[in-house]
Amino acid sequence: MHLKKIKFLSILCIAVFFQSCVTKPPESPDNICLIFKEKRSWYKAVMRAEKRWKIPPYVLMSFVYQESSFKSDARPERDKLLGFIPWFRPSTAVGYSQALTMTWDDYKDETGNSRANRKDFKDSADFIGWYASKGYYQGFERTDARSLYLAYHEGYGGFKKKTYRTKQWLVKVSDRVQARSTKYQQQYWGCAQDLKKKKFLFFG
């Protein structure tokens, strides 16, 4: 009995440890300036993605907000068998970007980032930038969060075929993504210079 209790406590401690390792969502998800002030590493990751893939910070962050609400372990809810029994998940999406396994593998192959983890914000930010950059060569505007999000969801082939037209719920979601991107953009313009200061990046 004593050994069973020790084993139980050990498992409990391990579970608590791993739970503590999960990065918590920002306290003020509606304000990009406060997000970057709280999450210094996120700011640097987004700046690297912008430099590499030319995706504006406010567009990228509007994607993350919509896809995962800034939760590192986000997954689609399980389907329900007979209406109440938890069943399989509808897709393989995981993490901040909700990237599908197959698309994530394509990203790793193309970029050489073989150790990329979908639950890592830096990797997820780079993934979103990588995927969005494909749209620039097809005539997408870098600030057109709505169209970029529709292509992100449907694939560029699906976007070209306008498959989203049969999904009014998706069109409404893409409108929300655009609205949030615009809101983040206005906020970002007011704090961009402060964010660039070294003391802001490494102290406080």
Language-model-detected regions and their locations in the chain:
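Residue-level detector of alpha-helix boundary/anchor positions
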Residues: 10-11, 58
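Catalytic glycan-binding domains that act on GlcNAc-containing polysaccharides
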Residues: 22-196
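Short, solvent-exposed mixed-charge patches
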Residues: 202-204
